[in-house]
Structure formats: structure tokens, C-alpha cells
Amino acid sequence: MPNYHVTLQAAYIVRNVDDVEDAISVTISQIGKMLNKEGLNYVDIDIGLTICPKCGELVDCVLVVARTALVGVLLSMKVFNAESPEHAIRIAKATIGKVLKNIPLEPVDVVELEK
């Protein structure tokens, strides 16, 4: 059975932040602590990117309003011995979703790894 690299997107809310950089730092720290506490230190955490509608540049996927931020997070992991890409997504969502309860997870990318 093939191995896959699965990337999921999550929407994470952070309170009491001053700016975008603060929101990013707090998000990575909080999610990292939750994942590491459950032994999921193999999950990679990145901040998503979006295209600025005005200038067309890539910017961090973070919105801060009234010291509350909505942060787009990318979580990726390798899934071994999955039957199909869809099966790999289900495994990744179940593994990460056990720790990040009540946080929506959507697949962004699935790549079959070469042996």
C-alpha cells in the first residue's frame, strides 16, 4: 500500500493578540503544545497564505479584529499504508482531529510518496 503526504487546512481563533505576528506566534505555540502533548510531534504546522485582492501579493492568512484573530493554519503529516488518497485524508483528519476538537479541518493537498 502506498504512503501519502497529507495537508489539511484549519481555521483557528486566537484571543488577546496585538497584531498579525503575535497571532501567528500564539497560534503555532498553542497548536504545537496540543499536538506534542498527545505525541503528534510529527505533524508540521505552517501558516496558510492567501492572495491580497488589491496588490496580488501572497500574504499570511490572518485576520485580526478587536484583539481577536482568525488564523488559517496548514497541518501536514505523512500517512503510511493507506489504501487510497481518500483513505489517507480520513486517517490524517482522524489523527489530528482527535487533538484539535471542534476545529474544522479540510484537505488541501494529498501527494503519493515514492517508495
Swiss-Prot record:
InterPro entries assigned to the protein according to its UniProt record, in alphabetical order: UPF0212
UniProt cross-references to Pfam families, sorted A to Z: DUF555
Membrane-crossing residue ranges in chain numbering: none
Family: Belongs to the UPF0212 family.
UniProt xrefs under PANTHER family: UPF0212 PROTEIN MJ0068, UPF0212 PROTEIN TK1194
NCBIfam families in alphabetical order: PRK03922.1
Protein name, entry field: UPF0212 protein MJ0068
